[in-house]
């Protein structure tokens, strides 16, 4: 969109010093009163601007107030080929910055604006068709959800009526009726998207300007692709609504990503992966998801440790039982040896006693034979 603005308005100043000079001042804070002698000239000038479609495409320029005009304000040449596109871009900035359009400074009522816009509606229709095609491509990259919600209330209005509603919304915002329009826009937005009802509220500080900008963005959409362009046509207010919608959708997207994040790592990968590798894989993930995955990893590791301890205990019990069986077998073998030795001892003892008894009988015939029992030992 910035490139189209640069192409359509080739006479804008390209010096960064001039743009910095304009941006450093808040032109709404000066509160310069208009001169009464210049009332007729200003009203006629504004009438020519509305009829000719030459509002400045720079947001900071306020050609219809008594503030010194911006260098970017200049009427387009009559023979330029981009005249219809300039019409559309001028209305785009007018709906995006309603705080610049002070009805007291313009000096005409909303009825005058309606007549001026209806008289120039045939030129606006041709420029709006070209703008809708460019806005459709922009909405496909930025997300058509917020644009469709902003364009929901403008499906039944034509392009001229949409710009008229934007002008009336700007006048109502300046006169103190901004809460009503903000509530109306919020109602349509909530009806269009139930999953983020708080989207479209840019903040308390710029609620009046954002509500008027949102109304202008909603009026900018007429039908299929133009409804997506309505969100971009809202300027500052529509952009704030889209940002709010993105912020409201962010937790849902994070939750949806978290549902499929467990499929990325199996239980075995979580257990075997090092802490450094896991932290590298979890970059850009929400804190709650990181805590949940690390808790799951700790639970799996504790479960594996408990299983290994149980296996070791069972294995050790089997080893001890096998050793016990071996020792029992050895004890039985020793008992058998003891019983065999006892039997041998008894046999030798019985033999000894027989020999001792036979030796006393033969002791009378041969005295040289030892008669002591130790002889047989």
Swiss-Prot record:
Residues 363-377 have a biased composition (Polar residues). Residues 213-244 have a biased composition (Gly residues). GO terms for molecular function: DNA-binding transcription factor activity, RNA polymerase II-specific; RNA polymerase II cis-regulatory region sequence-specific DNA binding. Keywords: Activator, DNA-binding, Isopeptide bond, Nucleus, Proto-oncogene, Repressor, Transcription, Transcription regulation, Tumor suppressor, Ubl conjugation. Residues 180-197 have a biased composition (Basic residues). It is found in: Nucleus. Residues 126-377 are annotated as: Represses ARE-mediated transcription. Residues 292-317 are annotated as: Basic motif. Residues 320-341 are annotated as: Leucine-zipper. Its main location: nucleus. Residues 57-84, 175-244, 358-377 are annotated as: Disordered. SUPFAM superfamilies: A DNA-binding domain in eukaryotic transcription factors, Leucine zipper domain. There is a cross-link at residues 29, 33, 335 (Glycyl lysine isopeptide (Lys-Gly) (interchain with G-Cter in SUMO2)). One of its GO terms (cellular component) is nucleus. It comes from the Eukaryota. Residues 292-355 form the bZIP domain. One of its GO terms (biological process) is regulation of transcription by RNA polymerase II. Ubiquitinated, leading to its degradation by the proteasome. Ubiquitination is triggered by glucocorticoids. Phosphorylated by GSK3 and MAPK13 on serine and threonine residues. The phosphorylation status can serve to either stimulate or inhibit transcription. PROSITE patterns: BZIP. Homodimer or heterodimer with other bHLH-Zip transcription factors. Binds DNA as a homodimer or as a heterodimer. Heterotetramer of two MAF and two USF2. Interacts with PAX6; the interaction is direct. Interacts with MYB; interaction takes place weakly in normal T-cells and increases in T-cells following stimulation through the TCR engagement. Interacts with MYB; the ternary complex formed with MYB and the CD13 promoter is regulated in response to differentiating signals. Interacts with USF2; the interaction inhibits its DNA-binding activity on the L7 promoter. Acts as a transcriptional activator or repressor. When overexpressed, represses anti-oxidant response element (ARE)-mediated transcription. Involved either as an oncogene or as a tumor suppressor, depending on the cell context. Binds to the ARE sites of detoxifying enzyme gene promoters. Involved in embryonic lens fiber cell development. Recruits the transcriptional coactivators CREBBP and/or EP300 to crystallin promoters leading to up-regulation of crystallin gene during lens fiber cell differentiation. Activates the expression of IL4 in T-helper 2 (Th2) cells. Belongs to the bZIP family. Maf subfamily. This is Transcription factor Maf.
């Amino acid at each position: 969109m910035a490139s189209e603005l640069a192409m359509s308005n080739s006479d804008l100043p390209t010096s960064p010093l001039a743009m910095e000079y304009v941006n450093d001042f808040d032109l709404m804070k000066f509160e310069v009163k208009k001169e009464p002698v210049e009332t007729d000239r200003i009203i006629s000038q504004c009438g020519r601007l509305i009829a000719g479609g030459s509002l400045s495409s720079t947001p900071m320029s306020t050609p219809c107030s008594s503030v010194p005009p911006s260098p970017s304000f200049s009427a387009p040449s009559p023979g330029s080929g981009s005249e219809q596109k300039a019409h559309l871009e001028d209305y785009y900035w007018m709906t995006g910055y309603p705080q610049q359009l002070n009805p007291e400074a313009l000096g005409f009522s909303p009825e005058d604006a309606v007549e001026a816009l209806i008289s120039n509606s045939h030129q606006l229709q041709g420029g709006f068709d070209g703008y809708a095609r460019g806005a459709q491509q922009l909405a496909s990259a930025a997300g058509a959800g917020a644009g469709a919600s902003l364009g929901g209330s403008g499906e039944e209005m034509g392009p001229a009526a949409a710009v008229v509603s934007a002008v009336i919304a700007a006048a109502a915002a300046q006169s103190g009726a901004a809460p009503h329009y903000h509530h109306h826009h919020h109602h349509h937005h909530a009806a269009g998207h139930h999953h983020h009802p708080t989207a479209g509220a840019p903040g308390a500080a710029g609620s009046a300007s954002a509500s008027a900008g949102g109304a202008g963005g909603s009026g900018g959409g007429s039908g299929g692709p133009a409804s997506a362009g309505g969100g971009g046509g809202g300027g500052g207010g529509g952009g704030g609504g889209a940002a709010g919608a993105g912020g409201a959708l962010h937790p849902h997207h994070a939750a949806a990503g978290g549902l499929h994040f467990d499929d990325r790592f199996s239980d075995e990968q979580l257990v075997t992966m090092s802490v450094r590798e896991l932290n590298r894989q979890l970059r850009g993930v929400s804190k709650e998801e990181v805590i949940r995955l690390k808790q799951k990893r700790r639970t799996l590791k504790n479960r594996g440790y408990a299983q290994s301890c149980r296996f070791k205990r069972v294995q050790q019990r089997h080893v001890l039982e096998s050793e016990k069986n071996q020792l029992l077998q050895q004890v039985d073998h020793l008992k058998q040896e003891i019983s065999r030795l006892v039997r041998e001892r008894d046999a030798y003892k019985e033999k000894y006693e027989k020999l001792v008894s036979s030796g006393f009988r033969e002791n009378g015939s041969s005295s040289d034979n030892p008669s002591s029992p130790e002889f047989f030992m």
